């Protein structure tokens, strides 16, 4: 379904009871974000919010994509899987053998459909150009400031248009924009992004780079801008496919080489000069739940701003999960499962990106396994597949027994307890965990080097005979070790989560206050030498400010803070007398000695003093007390129902100081 514009989408949301209008004055600086954070975490994503009284000429739309239902409405489908099924059908149709002329002629209607999705450039002006600011001034837009330590207000749902100067190929992406003055913002494109490649090409040619930013319009545009498409595939073709109608584009007024959606609410036109000095941009409370720290990025000079007469300013916030962006990620997970399966990993059955993994940190993949080593084959293929190159932790699962002909176990990978039992039943910590390194998201603060760090694959697939180490001692008996670990002997341990252990999943989570170099390595060895720990296959360590028994938040912190290649500690010992084997013995063992193994993973905060970590470590994102109090006091006026306390309250004591950079000592 194609929406004529954002206003039609707003009406549809309101008709379905998915939107609340807020008529009380709410400040775009921090207050809109605090209200949205409460609503988005209130269960099932809450409602979309239309702030009609912001002190500006334009209302602000928030949380429009923040639930499965609203995400489906934005894409015009009943279920997110519907898109994947349609894409898979197209792939099969195009790739199937055509035996005669009749079969080939049957393709013609489908090729006609392809043509109907291609974007079209209109010669007339668009709705987005109904009003032209004679003196462009982005500060007249209600650009929100999301978090107290942000560097300023940021445009958070910008649909950014650039072109390759050599091929004229368009790219549409989404990169935050910090507002510095009336006609100047930052342009936060990372080095891996296509727009950054375009920037570098303009730099080689010593040419000014035209750029245009759209806000609003059909809600599918913002999704298409986030989609992980191949470099030379036009995002507006994807948008046309999703809305079943081609996107109509118009030429910009001051940057006529760039075309933008006719139905957008706002267009911000301008340029980036490759010869400009870069600007110090940030901090910004990012989708990882941590601040991304300041760095140098290009300047975007605004040359024109146009908008519709009844324009609505769309925005989003990101931060500690879950947030609205989780549903944009879920749509990508579902939509791009079919292309991955049809082009790169044919054995893939399903894929899941848990919200605690904030997209790249944790991906679970279910495969149909048919031969030994297939898990490693999938691992390498996945890490080479577009934006999957940023993945940190990959968990593989498959059928429970290869001899059963590859039949899948009767659980979905979203059933996490059953999944974990399956994975850890089939996983030998000494042989089935693989480490690598490569490109990482620039926002990953755990890497010792910016954008380059460790990766880990946990192969939880059922093993063929060739993959099994017969010397591994599989222990079925597991002990509740929490009482032992929470004694005076382990004063550095603040909490222990044995909830998984109690469900026969051999994993525990331990919260530790580090006080010396090598503390986690030493502690892991000490714990593993206890007889009661012999059945445990993995121990996850988090920092002392984290409640290990708050499973979701502990996993979120753990995944963010781990560099798997740097932060792993494999303990391996003889089963008979618990004598620890050396690392060399682990890697080159030839004797027939039964052993057990436990993998330790250090997901604590890293510092210069204790870990020789040389980069700044960011703080988690928490609202300030003044903003929390202001929203508490005006809650009854907002029309949002029962009072919802600030989600930030549970995290206030987990901060290290008050700045975006965490204090080294606290």
Task: Identify what each model region corresponds to.
Residues 1-666:
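Extended, highly charged
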């Amino acid at each position: 379904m194609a929406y004529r514009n954002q206003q039609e989408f707003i009406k549809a949301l309101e008709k379905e009871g998915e939107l609340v209008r807020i008529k009380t004055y709410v400040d775009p600086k921090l207050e809109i974000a605090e209200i949205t954070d409460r609503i988005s975490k209130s269960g099932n994503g809450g409602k979309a919010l239309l702030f009609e009284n912001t002190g500006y000429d334009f209302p602000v739309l928030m949380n429009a994509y923040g639930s499965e239902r609203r995400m489906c409405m934005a894409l015009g489908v009943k279920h997110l899987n519907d898109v994947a099924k349609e894409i898979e059908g197209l792939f099969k149709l195009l790739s199937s053998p055509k035996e005669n002329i009749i079969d080939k002629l049957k393709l013609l209607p489908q090729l006609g459909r392809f043509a109907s999705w291609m974007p079209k450039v209109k010669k007339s002006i668009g709705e987005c150009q109904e009003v032209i600011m004679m003196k462009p001034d982005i500060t007249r837009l209600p650009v929100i400031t999301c978090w107290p330590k942000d560097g300023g207000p940021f445009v958070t749902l910008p649909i950014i248009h650039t072109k390759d100067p050599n091929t004229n190929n368009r790219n549409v992406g989404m990169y935050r924009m910090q507002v510095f003055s009336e006609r100047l913002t930052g342009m936060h494109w990372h080095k891996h992004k296509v727009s950054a490649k375009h920037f570098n090409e303009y730099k080689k040619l010593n040419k000014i780079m035209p750029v245009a930013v759209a806000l609003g319009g059909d809600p599918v545009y913002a999704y298409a801008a986030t989609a992980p498409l191949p470099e030379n595939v036009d995002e507006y073709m994807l948008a046309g496919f999703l809305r079943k109608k081609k996107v109509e584009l118009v030429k910009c007024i001051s940057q006529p080489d760039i075309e933008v959606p006719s139905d957008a609410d706002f267009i911000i036109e301008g340029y980036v000069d490759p010869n400009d000095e870069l600007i110090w941009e940030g901090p910004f409370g990012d989708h990882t739940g941590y601040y991304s720290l300041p760095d140098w990025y290009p300047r975007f000079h605004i040359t024109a701003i146009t908008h519709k007469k009844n324009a609505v300013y769309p925005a989003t916030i990101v931060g500690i999960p879950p947030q609205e962006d989780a549903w944009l990620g879920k749509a990508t997970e579902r939509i791009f499962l079919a292309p991955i399966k049809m082009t790169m990993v044919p054995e893939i059955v399903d894929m899941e990106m848990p919200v605690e993994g904030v997209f790249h940190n944790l991906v679970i993949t279910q495969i149909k396994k048919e031969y030994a080593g297939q898990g490693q084959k999938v691992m390498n293929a996945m890490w080479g597949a577009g934006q999957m190159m940023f993945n940190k932790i990959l968990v593989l699962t498959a059928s429970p027994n290869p001899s059963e002909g590859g039949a899948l176990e009767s659980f979905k990978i979203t059933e996490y307890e059953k999944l974990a039992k399956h994975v850890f039943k089939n996983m030998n910590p000494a042989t089935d965990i693989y480490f690598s390194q490569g490109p990482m998201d620039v926002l990953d603060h755990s890497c010792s080097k910016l954008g380059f760090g460790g990766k880990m694959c946990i192969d939880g697939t059922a093993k063929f005979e060739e993959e099994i180490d017969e010397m591994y001692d599989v222990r079925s008996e597991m002990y509740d070790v929490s009482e032992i670990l929470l004694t005076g002997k382990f004063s550095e341990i603040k909490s222990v989560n044995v909830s998984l252990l109690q469900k026969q999943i051999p994993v525990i989570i331990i919260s530790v206050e580090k006080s010396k170099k090598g503390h986690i390595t030493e502690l892991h060895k000490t714990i593993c030498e206890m007889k009661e720990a012999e059945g445990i296959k993995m121990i996850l360590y988090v920092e002392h400010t984290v409640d290990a028994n708050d499973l979701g938040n502990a996993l979120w912190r753990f995944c963010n803070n781990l560099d798997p290649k740097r932060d792993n500690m494999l303990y391996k010992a003889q089963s008979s007398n618990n004598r620890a084997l050396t690392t060399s013995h682990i890697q080159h063992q030839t004797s027939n000695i039964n052993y057990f193994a436990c993998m330790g993973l250090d997901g604590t905060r890293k510092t210069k003093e204790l870990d020789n970590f040389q980069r700044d470590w960011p703080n988690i994102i928490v609202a300030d007390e003044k903003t929390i109090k202001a929203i508490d006091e005006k809650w009854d006026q907002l029309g949002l129902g029962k009072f919802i306390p600030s989600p930030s309250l549970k995290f206030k004591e987990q901060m290290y100081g008050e700045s975006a950079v965490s204090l080294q000592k606290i």
